[in-house]
Amino acid sequence: MSAAKVSKKRKAVTKDVEEEAGVFSGDELNVGDIDGALSDDANDLSSDEEDSEVELVDDFSSDEDEDEEEELDSDEIPSDGEAPLKKKSGTSAADLEVPTNDDESSSEEEQPNFRIEKDANGNDRYIYDEINPDDNSDYSDVEENANTIGNIPLSFYDQYPHIGYDINGKKIMRPATGEALDALLDSIEIPKGFTGLTDPSTGKPLELSQDELELLRKVQMNEIPEEGYNPYEPLMEWFSNKQEIMPLSAAPEPKRRFVPSKHEAKRVMKIVKAIREGRILPYKPPSEEKEEDLELINYDLWADEAERPDHPMHVPAPKLPPPGYEESYHPPPEYLPDNKERKAWQEADPEDREREYLPTDFGSLRKVPGYGEFVKEKFERCLDLYLAPRVRRSKLNIDPESLLPKLPSPEELKPFPSVCATVFRGHKGRVRSLAVDPTGVWLATGGDDGTVRVWELLTGRQLYSVKVGEEDPVNVVRWRPSKDAVVLAAAAGDDIYLIVPPILDPELEQASLDLLDAGWGYAASKPAPKASEEGKKTTPPQWVRPSAALADNGVCAVIPLRYVAKSISWHRRGDYFVTVCPGSSTPASMAIAIHTLSKHLTQYPFSRRIKGGGPPQTAHFHPSKPILFVANQRTVRAYDLSRQLLVKIIQPGARWISSFDIHPTSSTASGGDNLIVGSYDRRLLWHDLELSQRPYKTLRYHRKAIRAVKFHPSGRYPLFADASDDGSLQIFHGSVTGDMLSNASIVPLKVLKGHKITGELGVMDLDWHPREAWCVSAGADGTCRLWM
């Protein structure tokens, strides 16, 4: 039992009872009984043992003991940790001896924390040791010179030399105040924990301890002040971590939950009976009062509010223009002025400046200062709003789609080529040129391997092949447009080869050979050139017969041009064809040559270089007029051969023209006055010569250079196409009418992709079937493709 309980038991008033023989008197008190009554082990006893112990203590107490205990103070009673006192019979309280424990294993907590002294009256006085608080104690150490005046302002002690009292009642003298020099030194050499405040209880400078500084640092850094506290301890689910199966939570379902309730059935039957009798109505119409209440609740304050119309003379204020790149705090470098521009802006008058500020690069937004002209700009804005007159401009509400031309659907414009039907393989290297014969049966190709090959168009079977260039590629091949004789012209190196393939029927082959042989007689009757003219470079070349090997393979004539020809174009009658040598080393007078098949004659129509636009690139005859179109790098010129005059100069605006073609229909239907131009700068241009010298339409659908453009040769299908280095062909619908009030209609139809890009080159050339809506393309991948 605790000491407090012992004291209560000793001071309790007990009734006098007679001593029995088995009860000990107070003088015969045993030490073991007292030890059991005062030690802490009594807490482990049961309630029955405590009751018996109280009875023993009451029996052991005597009248003399009660008187002595009444004289004891509460602070003289031993604490729970004190050892029991031994009392002998006939001894007083002064004779009590403090028992000592000789056992070395006893701890310091079991030693008594008091000593017994005599007071002034001679009574025993218990003097306790000072409490040494630990970390778990509510007590704290008191400083020796701590001021104990409490919550009293120090101004009460202004007239006294002291400022309070310590715990022993001694005066605490006022601390000495430093002079100005000391204050200056203190401000320079700031000690650790310095706050600049004065402690109201001591009058000394208030300094914080290391623990207080650490606490302030943690609070400032938003850290947890308490040491060792972990805010992210693992969650301990006290109520759900262990599933306890017991009748409270996992009891079996009662039977009443599966059996219909009889009481509910009775109540439902009462309601059904009342509904049948009419005492309960399933739907009760709301009363008028409730409807009025609902109307009042749902009243809309602005239900009848009408929008206030603007004044007839009201004109809204114009909005400020949105800021541009030059107003950014980190503008692009091209918007930043250099030193010259900055100096010119600073020297100019404010009225003459283009803008009120100079673009400045601050690097980051936090470095941007305040705008100095902010107030001035707002003031001028206010002046403009109420002083400047306003003008209302009517805005036209135009549908953007109405501005676009209404193009028909591609499905309505069929037929046009859309799929690859045949692939022609056999050339080694790039296929530079191809051509479909006027009958539409054969396809002629020429490539880097120096061979000219003739294929069957529908099947892709090779029928004829001849090698005309040992090291030079075949740059261009073209069929004679007439059907009475079949002649194939091929340019390889510096020569032009006229070939009659041995794949024709005998009659057609003989007619073709007779056409070429007729020219030999005219050339023989022509006077021979003089010796002085033979050395000139401008002397037209003489047609020669081929070698025996070439003659056996169908080559009938050779024209030595002395320069590489890149373009061949036949006249519609089949008796003339023009060649162009665009090389930079070619003389201007020999770049363009016109050849007569029936006379074996070559002429140079231009004695001087064409002005402007660079060397010539390609040339074509007009389909119905005696006009020759010659294209150089930048312009297309039309020459009247009968009058020998320059008719027109067409300016496509391209950097480098690669090819062009003339509309095949007659001039009476305005077809011959339209042409298309392809350029190496990825543009396809449509020209209406009656409209302007400039392009009517510019189409930019390719990512790389355009190599060839071509109209469909018959007027039956209004189709044209272009071939590009991006490996694709673009098919267009271009209808031309004779109405002078209507323009040409151009509709993109299909993008054909199949050739592989080899060496940055894609599709090199293309041609149309003379009767069908088919086209054939030659690629740098060594193949040709028929598109249907």
Swiss-Prot record:
Question: Where are the annotated segments for Disordered?
Answer: 1-125, 308-354
Compositional bias segments (type: Pro residues): 318-335
Question: Its Gene Ontology molecular function terms?
Answer: large ribosomal subunit rRNA binding; ribonucleoprotein complex binding
Query: Composition bias, kind Basic and acidic residues: at what positions?
Result: 115-125, 337-354
Compositionally biased intervals (Basic residues): 1-12
Pfam families in the record, alphabetically? BOP1NT (PF08145), WD40 (PF00400)
Subcellular location(s) of the protein: Nucleus, Nucleolus; Nucleus, Nucleoplasm
Which residue stretches does the UniProt record annotate as biased composition, category Acidic residues? 41-79, 100-111
Q: Give GO cellular component annotations, separated by semicolons.
A: nucleoplasm; PeBoW complex; preribosome, large subunit precursor
Major localization class: nucleus
Quote the PROSITE patterns the UniProt record gives.
WD_REPEATS_1, WD_REPEATS_2, WD_REPEATS_REGION
At which residues are the WD repeats? 426-465, 469-509, 611-649, 652-697, 701-742, 758-788
The record ties this protein, via InterPro entries, to: BOP1/Erb1 (IPR028598), BOP1_N_dom (IPR012953), WD40/YVTN_repeat-like_dom_sf (IPR015943), WD40_repeat_CS (IPR019775), WD40_repeat_dom_sf (IPR036322), WD40_rpt (IPR001680)
* A biological process from GO: maturation of 5.8S rRNA from tricistronic rRNA transcript (SSU-rRNA, 5.8S rRNA, LSU-rRNA)
Q: Which UniProt keywords apply?
A: Nucleus, Repeat, Ribosome biogenesis, rRNA processing, WD repeat
- Subunit-level organization: Component of the NOP7 complex, composed of erb1, nop7 and ytm1. The complex is held together by erb1, which interacts with nop7 via its N-terminal domain and with ytm1 via a high-affinity interaction between the seven-bladed beta-propeller domains of the 2 proteins. The NOP7 complex associates with the 66S pre-ribosome.
What is this protein's function per UniProt? Component of the NOP7 complex, which is required for maturation of the 25S and 5.8S ribosomal RNAs and formation of the 60S ribosome.
The record's similarity note reads: Belongs to the WD repeat BOP1/ERB1 family.
This chain belongs to the protein called Ribosome biogenesis protein erb1
Species whose genome carries this gene: Aspergillus niger (strain ATCC MYA-4892 / CBS 513.88 / FGSC A1513)
